């Protein structure tokens, strides 16, 4: 009889602890959501602050200038090669077509 009472008591304790664990999950989820929202806001604030620094503006201007220079170089290079390819693949009459 005592073993049955002990078994029932153990099952009730397990059931009660399972219920207690279920109660903690939503609060843990809420805690994690709050943490993620706080981290997101902090990151956005930091990026906004970084955009306001003169050094960041200088870096953006430098990158924009270098990218523009690279685009100019690329268009010059492709212009030279496109002329080369156009002249190479020009249609030249073959001796058989001249004989007709």
Swiss-Prot record:
UniProt keyword list: Chylomicron, Glycoprotein, Lipid degradation, Lipid metabolism, Lipid transport, Secreted, Sialic acid, Signal, Transport, VLDL
Entry PTM: The most abundant glycoforms are characterized by an O-linked disaccharide galactose linked to N-acetylgalactosamine (Gal-GalNAc), further modified with up to 3 sialic acid residues. Less abundant glycoforms are characterized by more complex and fucosylated glycan moieties. O-glycosylated on Thr-94 with a core 1 or possibly core 8 glycan.
Primary location recorded for the protein, binned into one broad class: secreted
InterPro entries: Apo-CIII, Apo_CIII_sf
GO biological process: cholesterol efflux; cholesterol homeostasis; chylomicron remnant clearance; G protein-coupled receptor signaling pathway; high-density lipoprotein particle remodeling; lipoprotein metabolic process; negative regulation of cholesterol import; negative regulation of fatty acid biosynthetic process
Chain residue ranges for the region called Lipid-binding: 68-99
Gene3D superfamilies xrefs: Apolipoprotein CIII
Protein family according to the UniProt entry: Belongs to the apolipoprotein C3 family.
Protein name: Apolipoprotein C-III
